[in-house]
Amino acid sequence: MNQPKKSDSLMTFWDHLEALRGVILKILAVAMAGFIIAFCFKEPLFKLILAPSSPDFILYKWISTFGDFNVDMFSTTLTAQFMIHMKMAFYFSLVVIMPYTLYLLFGFISPALYQNERRSTTKVVVWSYILFMTGIILDYLIIFPLAFRFLGTYQVSPTIPNVITLESYTDLLITLTLLMGILFELPILAWFLGKLGVIDKAFMKKYRRHAIVVILIIAAIITPTTDIFTLTIVTLPIYLLYELSISIVK
């Protein structure tokens, strides 16, 4: 069996702590640089962030049955726009530097792993990142625009106009983005639970119908609409994730 590197076994607790400190400082430095760059490029950053609020967004062009709609956004407090600018620059920088962060963290723990563990961990880290980013992209292109269009134009009475704040828009964007990113980690979670012996392929197949009901409920919560087409668009990717999870669980 392959053993961990000898140099790692000779390191003291304080050596490990110093190495971890170096990794954290590098991550913080890159995060700060990413934040400053994102903050300085305000116009392209918010052009990207606000694109789903425009009737010309790519999804609305694909699905012509949506028709035209217009949602005006407002800022209601003196500091709101500046604070939102900082917040979105911070979150954007976190997403951008994620590969480098994972690379540094893996470099820190890999010397303590056996060679076969190192290969397995590399695959898990890479696929976790790919799935998380896939969830983010799907949310930006499909899930969030559908939710925004429905909630932004929904009225209990024609006499009550919607006044959408920039803060509520960005909060929903962040929430759904994080939710979809985590949701797309389902295959990784299933693989891990399978390794622990908690679930297996037969278990997931047996409860497939129950899972479909749960998936429909989750999709309905994410996009609260009575439109069957929209519900299907949201449900299908999540269901495919479940089927993918079945295929990788032994």
Segments (PLM) and residue ranges:
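Membrane topogenic/interface segments and analogous intrinsically disordered interaction regions
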Residues: 1-250
